[in-house]
Amino acid sequence: MLRLFLSHLLGVWLLLSLRARKIPAQEEVLKACGREFVRLQIRICGSLSWGKSSQQHREPRQAPAALPEIVSSSITSGAEALNGMLEYIPDLPQELKATLSEREPSFRELQPSLKDSNLNLEEVEKSILGRQNEAEDQSLSQLGRSRLDAHSRIKRSDYIRYSDRCCNVGCTRKELADLC
């Protein structure tokens, strides 16, 4: 009889403790305005991202096997960049261009050839900057035509609506986590 009573008492105690744990802090209504709202938002979004990273078990890192491939590709891209720069130099001797196509010369090998050619650094800079400005203008016009700017406005308006609501009425942690 005593054993049955204790088991029922233990069951009631477990149910009550489970009920107390079941009320999450996310349902608590918080009022925050201005800086307090921003700090709360940062705290909530930061805790969400840290929680995700701490739940993942990370394996020990090993050295990448493709390291030589990465180094060789960076050397190749450096040579391509140098060849691209040399296209902008009009008075460059053909011997130097042929040397570049055969192998990648060091700067010391290039220096005498560059002294012989009458290079005007300002002309090179103007031509490079002119092409960069044209590329920037094209990318900005493409962005204006796309709907990316409209999406950012919508997201910003959602954020403003939540901040006003949290200041005047109050909001829950779950609602703030939706903005992350």
UniProtKB/Swiss-Prot annotation:
InterPro entries the UniProt entry points to: Insulin-like, Insulin-like_sf, Insulin_CS, Relaxin, Repro_Hormone_Insulin-like
Q: What is this protein called?
A: Prorelaxin
Propeptide at which positions? 53-154
Family, similarity comment? Belongs to the insulin family.
GO molecular-function annotation terms?
hormone activity
- Where does it localize? Secreted
Q: Which residues form a coiled coil?
A: none
Annotated signal sequence range: 1-25
- Provide the free-text tissue specificity comment from this protein's UniProt record: Expressed by the placenta. Exclusively detected in cells located in the lamellar placental labyrinth and absent from other placental and non-placental uterine parts.
Subunit structure as annotated in this protein's UniProt entry: Heterodimer of a B chain and an A chain linked by two disulfide bonds.
Q: Which UniProt keywords apply?
A: Cleavage on pair of basic residues, Disulfide bond, Hormone, Secreted, Signal
Give the function comment from the record: Relaxin is an ovarian hormone that acts with estrogen to produce dilatation of the birth canal in many mammals.
Query: Which CDD domains does this one have?
Result: IlGF_relaxin_like
- Tell me the classification of the organism that encodes this protein: Eukaryota, Metazoa, Chordata, Craniata, Vertebrata
The disulfide bridges present are 33-167, 45-180, 166-171
Has keyword Secreted? Answer: yes
Any single Gene Ontology cellular-component annotation: extracellular region
